[in-house]
Design a protein with these regions (language model features):
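Charged, alpha-helix-forming regions
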Residues: 1-192
Length: 192
């Protein structure tokens, strides 16, 4: 099988924990101070994560080599936009940049209700930015300077230890334009 064919297959299909699909992990519209219970775990979010955030996260994970244990995922925002929207026009680039910055600040707390323990993690530990950036100007960073992300260590462990996983056809997911339809598709892949 050619290298290009392998890359195409890897980019079209990703594995995600069932909890991310069969629960309201990503909502259609932003919902503040959200939490939900699944099994013996309560998931709390510090910010609203919508299906658009899910689309960015899923597409970022599609750049990860499944055989490389590194948490570093290298890509350009243009490549990410082309995967998500099939176009890297300025509107899509700006939308993707904003969603990336929001994902970097998103924190999730999982409370084990049986053992009365919890863990807090971020989905994206940090964004790789080419060159020096003033902290006050970070919100206005140019998309061309974003070179990839580092996935949070705890989030990677959750992805690797997920007892129940499901597959997501990224090409189908990205072809859906309606947020509601995307959220429904995300939900139903957990039951396939």
């Amino acid at each position: 099988m050619s290298r290009r064919k392998k890359e195409t297959i890897a980019n079209e299909f990703i594995i995600v924990p069932k909890d991310m699909a069969t629960t309201p992990f990503f909502t259609v519209t932003p919902q503040e101070n959200r939490s939900f219970i699944t099994g013996c775990r309560r998931w709390d979010f510090n910010m609203p994560l919508t299906i658009e955030h899910g689309a960015v996260l899923y597409n970022i994970l599609s750049f990860k080599d499944p055989f490389n244990p590194s948490r570093d995922i290298e890509f350009s925002v243009c490549e990410l936009c082309k995967r998500m929207f099939t176009s890297d026009n300025s509107e899509n680039l700006e939308k993707t940049r904003k969603l990336l910055l929001q994902l970097e600040t998103a924190k999730v707390r999982i409370v084990d209700l049986d053992k009365d323990r919890y863990q807090i993690f971020r989905l994206i530990e940090r964004i790789w930015i080419e060159g020096e950036v003033d902290k006050n100007l970070r919100e206005n960073i140019a998309t061309s300077r974003i070179k990839g992300v580092v996935i949070d260590k705890t989030f990677v462990e959750i992805l690797e230890k997920a007892a129940e996983i499901t597959g997501l056809n990224l090409q189908e997911f990205n072809s859906i334009r309606s947020k509601i339809a995307k959220a429904i598709y995300n939900y139903f892949i957990g039951y396939i």
